[in-house]
Amino acid sequence: MVGATKSKRMHARNAAAVAAAGALAVGIVSIPAAPAHAADTITATDQAYFGYYGLDRARAKGYTGKGVTIAMIDGKVDTSVPELAGANITVKIPCTITTSPSVESHGTGVASILVSADYGVAPKVSLLAYQGRFGGNGDRGASDCDQPGGVGKDSQPWLLNSAMNDGAQIINLSASTPNEYKELKWVTARAIAQQVILVNAAGNDSTNDDDTSLSKWSGVVGVSAIGVDDNRQNYSSWGQGVVTASIGGPFSFHDLASGEVTQGSGTSFSTPVVTGVLALAKQRWPEATSNQLLQLLVKTGLNPDHGWNQYTGFGAIDPGAILNTDPSQFPDENPLMEKQGGSSPTLEEVQQYADGVVDPTDIVNDNSYTYRGLDESMLEDSLNVYPTHLGTSPRYHRK
């Protein structure tokens, strides 16, 4: 985790351990380093990814992400830091969460990679910044976070659906995931059906982190980390969910506890780079579907012949190729539906969601869902909070 404690690495594995004990715990995935300097100003020259990807040239051509809405689920974003001055950020606090400066530093840093006027990848996007609860890093939620059924307002399923409810087109999650949530399957099914792109950090355990990664699910863009030497970073985790890679640091950000500018590296920071580039692609290719943009990401990856491996996916991201290759030539099909070794939701499960026949008690905070199945007990189930129209699913009327 990035934060005030520079000598201690917070592992994403903390998430699995605490979540298994019945608490929401999401390990924030980045690695701290020593303080860089105490100056207030952070510039593009301080950020390894900015020059590496030639983002000044993208800006010169007008590619800023204008008109695109990104959401992030992370620590609370402090919009008062100088690097976020003028950025279009709406901070969303779902309930009362007791947190720490280190978690807020992480969220604020991730936001700055996305939208900083000085060094943001997509400085003109509209950013919805949702505060989550990261129990593995000491966060605690108050009773107003609780919901019937046990999936609270501070949980990932709830917040991912909040972002889609609010119109997010791309969602950044620089954190690991307690995958015991069965609701995550239907969150990702919704994202696939509605063509919302989910982007997730692979982790920093230098191991196969599928068990604590949202990116193990179909449709999700898992991001590992490379260095400016183009090599995969030793800390970067891997697995079937990895789709691409980008520069993971060193990244300069404000430590909100000390006020100093510090540095860190990790897939927490490689992930918003990918999210930002996808926002640039949405602006550059407004007629393309999100499925076609994912096809573009896969087909421009820098692995030889765009082949897949568990370390860098289809290869490191190539923003230049993405902004210069028309995705309309690619099929309007999600290329991440069946990940290596199999993944869920399947196409049939996505169709079940779209047809409204998924058990509504397995779905949380989804303002687009209507149950259209045949189970009459749903009419009386107190946990079913969705409109219910029995027998009206399109699957019952297709010829």
What is the predicted role of each segment?
Residues 42-70, 93-99, 318:
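N-terminal domain-start motif of subtilase-like serine proteases
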Residues 75-79, 95-98, 119, 133-137, ...:
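Solvent-exposed loop/turn segments at secondary-structure junctions
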Residues 74, 212-283, 287:
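Extracellular S/T/G-rich loop segment that most often corresponds to the catalytic His/Ser-adjacent loop
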